[in-house]
Amino acid sequence: LLLLSACNQNETKGNLHITGNIKGLKKGTLYIQRVVDTTLVAIDTIHIDGISTFESNLDLKSPEMLYLFLDRGVSNSLDNNLSFFAEPGTITIETSLDRYLSDAKITGSKNQEIFEEYKKINTRFTDENLTLIEKRFNAIKNKDTKAADSLSAKQDSNTKRKYLFATNFALNNRDFEVAPYIA
């Protein structure tokens, strides 16, 4: 007789291991989501009850943008959905409940590093555009059409520079899967 026995092993399934901590979160539900046919679909659900750390193992066919949605039970606003670029390996997400998006530190993904670099530079274009909008609004309020027209032209130029930067950044990082998300 041949006797086969199986051991109880804690094997992790999948090629992506996600760990994290949301400081200050005592109770809530996290959903790891992906876009399927223009809709966010949950691929894992994590219940938080007393301990703010979490862990998930997923199987990715290729690197892609995923979203960590925090259901606080009170609101369903945009500041509850944290995007991150996932790729096989280990990714760590550290943030806080009070400043869920702005405190987020995501490590373990080269594509995420490139995406963060792009977002940092892109923020400068957005900030410049907001300043120009404010100046243009004041010029219109003061009935200074010449200044308003000049500021409108500067806004157009800033928008073109923003698009050119995004295209150039994507081309310079074309070997990474994040490039199409930028361009």
Please provide the spans of the model-predicted regions:
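Sec-dependent bacterial lipoprotein signal peptides
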Residues: 1-7
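A non-transmembrane, solvent-exposed segment enriched in polar/low-complexity residues
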Residues: 7-153
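A general alpha-helix detector
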Residues: 150, 165, 181-182
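Amphipathic alpha-helical coiled-coil segments
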Residues: 156-174
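Alpha-helical protein-protein interaction scaffolds
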Residues: 174, 179-183
